[in-house]
Structure formats: structure tokens, C-alpha cells
Amino acid sequence: MNFKTALICFALLLIGTLCSAYSNQERQRDSRRVAEIMRTSLDDNTKINRIQELLTIYNRMAPSLRPDERARIDRFISRHTEGIIVDGVPSQGGARKIFKKTLSPAAKSVATGFFTELGASLASLFTSWFPTTTTERNH
């Protein structure tokens, strides 16, 4: 009886892991979404508003990245999100979020630079996973 219980638990664990993995379909969908976000975000406010969506996509793909890729992007995100101040108080705990507030021109410049670099990093990763996707769209 103990062996059967252990086998069932192992099977459930294996099935759960396989079902929660980042599938190729999800990667392709996120790849298309990142490309769309980057292509349609023309003004500063749109870029700032879409940072959270890029972070959400990154959080979905992060477990399937190589450790060095993940560490590089995590350092980049931490460098730009740890110092975010909301109503004069640093943000604390929970998922990283960019809060939409009235930003000074300097802060807006930093935020749009963050958007551009994060989007380019994600697009580069997707291009390495799906090298034909980019070339097919250009033809």
C-alpha cells in the first residue's frame, strides 16, 4: 500500500510539473506579444504603462532561462525597480510593480529607457528560442 501511495504521489508531481512548464505555444505567444508591445509603444506614457506587462512576461519565462541569462536580467530589473518611490515611500515586498504616477522628465526618461532595454532583452531571448520567427516576419 505504501508503494502505491508513493507511486501515485510521484505521478501527480510529474504530471503537475509537466503541465505547469512554459510550453512552446506560450513562448511563441509571449514572443509575439513582446514584439507587439515594442512596436506599438510609441510615446513615453504608453511605454511606462506597459512595463508591468513586460515584467509579467519575464516572470513567466524566467524559470526556463539559463542561470546566467536569468541572473543578468534579474540584476537589471533590481537595479531599476528597487529605488522606485511611490508617494514618497520606497515600494516594499511582493511582486515588482511599476506604479503609474506623475513622473518628472528625468524619471520618465529612466522609465522609458528601462522599458526599451527590458523589451530588447526579452525580444533577444525569444529570438534565440525561435530564430525563424523574426526572419519570417521580415519577408
Curated annotation (Swiss-Prot):
Pfam families: Turandot
Signal sequence interval, chain numbering: 1-21
Similarity comment: family membership: Belongs to the Turandot family.
Protein name (database record): Protein Turandot B
CC annotations in GO: extracellular space
The species this protein was found in: Drosophila sechellia (Fruit fly)
Primary site of residence: secreted
Subcellular location, record wording: Secreted
Superkingdom of source: Eukaryota
One GO BP: response to bacterium
Transmembrane region(s): none
Keywords assigned by UniProt, alphabetized: Immunity, Innate immunity, Secreted, Signal
Function: A humoral factor that may play a role in stress tolerance.
